[in-house]
From Swiss-Prot:
Protein name: Tyrosine-specific transport system
Localization terms from the record: Cell inner membrane
Cytoplasmic domain ranges by topology: 1-8, 56-80, 143-147, 205-216, 296-307, 353-375
GO cellular component, one term: plasma membrane
Family of the protein in this entry: Belongs to the amino acid/polyamine transporter 2 family. Mtr/TnaB/TyrP permease subfamily.
Gene name linked to the record: tyrP
Residue intervals on the Periplasmic side: 30-34, 102-121, 169-183, 238-274, 329-331, 397-403
Catalytic activity: L-tyrosine(in) + H(+)(in) = L-tyrosine(out) + H(+)(out)
InterPro entries recorded: Amino_acid_transport_2, Trp/try_permease_CS, Trp_tyr_transpt
Matching PANTHER family: LOW AFFINITY TRYPTOPHAN PERMEASE-RELATED, TYROSINE-SPECIFIC TRANSPORT SYSTEM
Activity regulation: Inhibited by the uncoupler carbonyl cyanide m-chlorophenylhydrazone (CCCP).
Domain of life of the native organism: Bacteria
Amino acid sequence: MKNRTLGSVFIVAGTTIGAGMLAMPLAAAGVGFSVTLILLIGLWALMCYTALLLLEVYQHVPADTGLGTLAKRYLGRYGQWLTGFSMMFLMYALTAAYISGAGELLASSISDWTGISMSATAGVLLFTFVAGGVVCVGTSLVDLFNRFLFSAKIIFLVVMLVLLLPHIHKVNLLTLPLQQGLALSAIPVIFTSFGFHGSVPSIVSYMDGNIRKLRWVFIIGSAIPLVAYIFWQVATLGSIDSTTFMGLLANHAGLNGLLQALREMVASPHVELAVHLFADLALATSFLGVALGLFDYLADLFQRSNTVGGRLQTGAITFLPPLAFALFYPRGFVMALGYAGVALAVLALIIPSLLTWQSRKHNPQAGYRVKGGRPALVVVFLCGIAVIGVQFLIAAGLLPEVG
């Protein structure tokens, strides 16, 4: 069980530390480090709390119960439908975000390293064909690729932070370049970067429903990304003053804008290479994990056979919709992450608060109960509504877009 506990911590941390981390400096550039730090700690606490709420609900059902079945038990058919729709939307939005971001970076990498000019569209198509092919072959190949890529990603993250440390200036971290509305606009992107709740049912099953150990799995597993994110913000926001950063992002939108900002301010080929490689690996590992989950979910939903023809059909319905998004909205990486925040707000905030409310009515003498009582459940529910509201205000143009 010790190995399973450690493995589960890494699953939570590995699911969380991914491409969302790359979008954070884009969201934080106009907000400032101190406000970003408050948002990071606040949203981490919120997401960790709701994972513990799900754990409280799971103590009353078999450990291998799916989230949809749990929703049907406590919230009825409509609750099950809302949960299923949110899961589908979340995984499609994330897959689209990762295809968009990875395709852009792949095209840039190939152009830099080979001298052959490649458009972002060609990069998106190439990445989808290769990485999507790996997913279509099956879990064993994904696992093989993911072990190598994740190990390399952690190495490059450490290298990247070490190389950026000498370029950090305290004054950049102390300035407060708060533009009106940007703090609110940054919430969906940072919130999505703490999303691991889709894997909660799998981890509960893997740990055989051991509540005591699962509490530490979710607390430590989500705290590791928090620490990594804080160091990443110190490294990026500390290296580049906000005025320069915002100016560069105006000329070079998206992830390439971040890389361009680091390239111009730090002026070190080693830093640029480390950041670029980490970005590529973060997007690849995030894509493989989410796309595999989406592929298996759709194969089960549409009852596709496990033959070559069946897997190709599942591959088509898995990758064609997000590919179309990536092609028609080539700068949609941050936007797609924000929309994923809508579905994640339902799955990670609204659904857990409702499930816990109903579970406590059905099981008043629960052995494990998260502190906070009903007022905390109301706050969690309202936070879910607020995250969704912020995203729609951004879409309506009433709040500024980030990145």
